[in-house]
Amino acid sequence: MNGLKLRYLLADLEPVRGKVLDVGCGAGSVAKAVKRERPDLDVAACDVSRSALAIAAASPEGVVFRVAEAEKLPYSDGEFDAVWIFDVLEHVEKPELVLREVARVLRPGGRFHIVLPLEGQPWTLYRFIGCGTRWTAKRRHGGHIQVFSAERFSGLAAFCGLPVTATRWSYHFVLQVLDILYFTWLDWRGPVGGSVEDMAAERAGIAGSVMRAASMTVATLAWGEATLFADLPGGCGHFSCTRG
């Protein structure tokens, strides 16, 4: 799904010129991909994890990396023309503090793009099984301490000066089923120290080949499903916002 997330981000960044920021960049793969696709942009990125940033900074590829908390960004007011966040807000205690900081460092009219799991979205399997209440595997194994719906996020974003202007969707039926099965399996087995993709890449022999083939098949199905149903609500939102 990372390719789809990047595609939607780049579409949002198409009219943007100047300076952009990746908040919660991890090891920097998205920031570097944006810099490769848009070498005209000045790309900055930050994360709270020093170990992840050490990996990112080992080969920065033109991106300026910095250690920072999302709730307290070390940048000037209105410094950026666009900001994006992938899969971060569900992990923080006070998401409104993060959104206020994004609004602060964005110039008026600047673009904000966020990818956010919507495990409280009506008509999803997550909502049906009670994600975050009856079913808490993603809280324990994925650190998802917030459960969002599109309505909750849109209200919070508007309150913080970042009204939503467009929404795309992913994580429809296929990925919801697999996601729930995976975290339920973790509940039964215990932590495995990596994703399914990591395990498939590391496994040798026939078992590894089968896992890699299965992973590719699932990725293809998920991409097709998300592309076909991009305008129908799902378990993940790709929100475009504009700084008021």
Which residues does each predicted region cover?
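S-adenosyl-L-methionine-dependent methyltransferase catalytic module, highlighting the catalytic core
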Residues: 1-4, 29, 59, 93-101, ...
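Active-site micro-motifs of SAM-dependent methyltransferase domains
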Residues: 72, 90, 155
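Conserved N-terminal segment of class I S-adenosyl-L-methionine
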Residues: 1-76, 82-86, 99, 169, ...
